[in-house]
Amino acid sequence: MKTLFTSVVLCGALVVSSSFAEEKATXQTAQSVVTTQAEAQVAPAVVSDKLNINTATASEIQKSLTGIGAKKAEAIVQYREKHGNFXNAEQLLEVQGIGKATLEKNRDRIIF
């Protein structure tokens, strides 16, 4: 009888501990999925030495691109807000104040 009681207690302890472990693993997995999704939704404007022209602020554009001051950087942001994201580098030529020389200086620094 004593052995039966001990066996029942041990089995109960195993069942309870395994359900706690399963809940903890499920909670950790859900938390990591939420964190990963949140990180994926925010595309960084500057990736190493590249600037995402579609997500960068005027300040980031000014700091990262050669020959772009505050006014041109703001013009890029305003153009993007009015016309949508840039699909290629040549579209920057449509922004007032951005010419071919400025585009060529920065072409390798821009990503979309």
Curated annotation (Swiss-Prot):
InterPro entries according to UniProt: Competence_ComEA_HhH, Endo/Exo/Phosphatase_dom_1, RuvA_2-like
Pfam families: HHH_3 (PF12836)
This protein's UniProt keywords: Repeat, Signal
Biological processes per GO annotation: protein secretion by the type II secretion system
Stored SUPFAM superfamilies: RuvA domain 2-like (SSF47781)
Signal peptide limits: 1-21
One term under GO cellular component: type II protein secretion system complex
Positions of the HhH domain: 49-79, 80-109
Name listed for the protein in its UniProt record: Uncharacterized protein HI_1008
Species name: Haemophilus influenzae (strain ATCC 51907 / DSM 11121 / KW20 / Rd)
Upper taxonomic lineage: Bacteria, Pseudomonadati, Pseudomonadota, Gammaproteobacteria, Pasteurellales
